[in-house]
Amino acid sequence: MIKWLARPADYGSVWDAMKAFTAARGPGTADEIWLCEHAPVYTLGQAGRPEHLLNPGLIPVVHCDRGGQVTYHGPGQVLAYTLFDLRRAGLYVREYVDMLEQATLATLRELGLEQACRKPGAPGIYVPQPGGELAKIAALGVKVRNGYAYHGLALNIDMDLSPFLGINPCGYEGLRTVDLAACGVRTSVERAGELLAAQLARAHGHAVQQRAAALAGVPG
């Protein structure tokens, strides 16, 4: 199921809802994708180090249980929270992250951003800049508990990027961030979110089908 949350969504409330959903689910619980746009907030993951918060100013900082370092969420960015049963899909965490990245790349290609790419050793999606620099356009951070995943990814659409200057994004000093608008792609948060959710649902559904076929002894 794909659903939009009320906007702007309070980060703490959504995080609590994800934890409650994950704690209550069982083997038969349907997977869900939650789409939202957050009010301005910095989030610091489990590996987050306070020295990467350079100048948060008046923007709230939330320490959360996802993987990764520090990032920023705000208006003009779409969040896709993927509440997936990884055991049902037969996915290890690294395979799951790979699936999220591939779905994001497919979404960006749909939107006309063909040059988006991955960066070895640095989760997320990047866009080459003049001079060869890679600027980050999508960030990933996941949590897996008892085989159930939550949190997900953030894709920059058309936003005020200046709050990223108050941090070392994802723990990388000097890492540049961009959005679709800066790359010459004009679209809405709603359209980008729907395309992203469709790609995520398709990729995860395919993994679930392959796992079911393997368990049944049917060639994939």
Curated annotation (Swiss-Prot):
Domain BPL/LPL catalytic residue range list: 27-208
Main subcellular location: cytoplasm
Pathway stated in the Swiss-Prot or TrEMBL entry: Protein modification; protein lipoylation via endogenous pathway; protein N(6)-(lipoyl)lysine from octanoyl-[acyl-carrier-protein]: step 1/2
Reactions catalysed according to its record: octanoyl-[ACP] + L-lysyl-[protein] = N(6)-octanoyl-L-lysyl-[protein] + holo-[ACP] + H(+)
Residues that bind substrate: R66, G67, G68, Q69, V70, T71, Y72, H73, A139, L140, G141, G152, L153, A154
Active site: C170
Gene Ontology molecular-function annotations: lipoyl(octanoyl) transferase activity
Listed GO biological process terms: protein modification process
One Pfam entry name: LplA-B_cat
Xref: InterPro entries: aa-tRNA-synth_II/BPL/LPL, BPL_LPL_catalytic, Octanoyltransferase, Octanoyltransferase_CS
UniProt-listed Enzyme Commission number(s): 2.3.1.181
Entry keyword set: Acyltransferase, Cytoplasm, Transferase
Function: Catalyzes the transfer of endogenously produced octanoic acid from octanoyl-acyl-carrier-protein onto the lipoyl domains of lipoate-dependent enzymes. Lipoyl-ACP can also act as a substrate although octanoyl-ACP is likely to be the physiological substrate.
NCBIfam families, A to Z: lipB (TIGR00214), PRK14342.1 (NF010922)
Record PANTHER family: LIPOYLTRANSFERASE 2, MITOCHONDRIAL-RELATED (PTHR10993:SF7), OCTANOYLTRANSFERASE (PTHR10993)
Protein name in the entry: Octanoyltransferase
Lineage: Bacteria, Pseudomonadati, Pseudomonadota, Betaproteobacteria, Burkholderiales
